[in-house]
Amino acid sequence: MNLSLRRSTSALLASSLLLTIGHGATLPFMTIYLSRQYSLSVDLIGYAMTIALTIGVVFSLGFGILADKFDKKRYMLLAITAFASGFIAIPLVNNVTLVVLFFALINCAYSVFATVLKAWFADNLSSTSKTKIFSINYTMLNIGWTIGPPLGTLLVMQSINLPFWLAAICSA
């Protein structure tokens, strides 16, 4: 693997880890956030989360199909920008509908990034490197989901908005 490809691969693996830490720090606390900030009942929170996650999945399917038609690096940068923008916007808006839409955007961006990242690895890595890099990426995802929720717990005890700011910083 040449130096440029090695650097790109390392940067993408680090991005995968950081985005997952940010997502893991916020996803478990969305119910608390919606309850505290907007006094939503449990059933309304369930509907809001279901809508946000469903929108994210449906749109990510379409964007995943488009991934092969466009420059993957640019597509990943767009996903990271959308991810960061969503996490910056959630604590700043004062409207539950916008929060749900931004959360849908975040989930879509996370799914798109993950899909396009795998496609980039498949397109650019040699067959001998693919197995190793895919394995490392899954390890990064597991580490991110292991670190994110406890870190989110520590932050939410200080301020309900801190996990969102962490997620935005992680994606920068």
List each model region and its residues:
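Transmembrane alpha-helix termini and helix-breaking/packing motifs in multi-pass membrane transporters
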Residues: 147-163
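Cytoplasmic helix-loop-helix junction between adjacent transmembrane helices
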Residues: 104-141
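Structural signature of the two symmetry-related core transmembrane helices
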Residues: 74-89
